């Protein structure tokens, strides 16, 4: 039963990060220890986010507290609605 809860949480995270990546939106990533990182999401997988600024940093997701985009991603609104429609089927 617990695995189903995790599976439902992932469709929110992946489309959101993907929209930030595709639209090359600057983000501030706050870590659980209070450190603020800034840059653009270059890539991501299940465990890490590659954040590009002057250099590329590999940030482990378990260390991330909050991601704050400079603006809302446009593509995310469409993908979120599409995901909600699939979930209701």
UniProtKB/Swiss-Prot annotation:
Keywords for the protein's UniProt record, in alphabetical order: RNA-binding, Stress response
Listed Pfam families: Hfq
Domain Sm residue range list: 14-73
Cellular component aspect of the GO annotation: cytosol
One GO process term, biological-process aspect: regulation of DNA-templated transcription
Record's keyword annotation contains RNA-binding: yes
Organism domain of life: Bacteria
Assembly and binders: Homohexamer.
Similarity comment: Belongs to the Hfq family.
Protein name according to UniProt: RNA-binding protein Hfq
Taxon lineage: Bacteria, Pseudomonadati, Pseudomonadota, Gammaproteobacteria, Thiotrichales
């Amino acid at each position: 039963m617990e695995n189903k809860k995790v599976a439902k949480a992932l469709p929110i995270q992946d489309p959101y990060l993907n929209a930030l990546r595709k639209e090359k939106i600057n983000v501030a990533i706050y870590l659980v220890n209070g450190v603020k990182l800034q840059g653009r999401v270059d890539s991501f997988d299940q465990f890490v986010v590659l954040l590009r600024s002057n250099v590329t940093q590999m940030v482990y997701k378990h260390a991330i507290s909050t991601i704050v985009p400079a603006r809302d991603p446009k593509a995310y609104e469409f993908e979120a609605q599409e995901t909600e429609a699939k979930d209701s089927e």
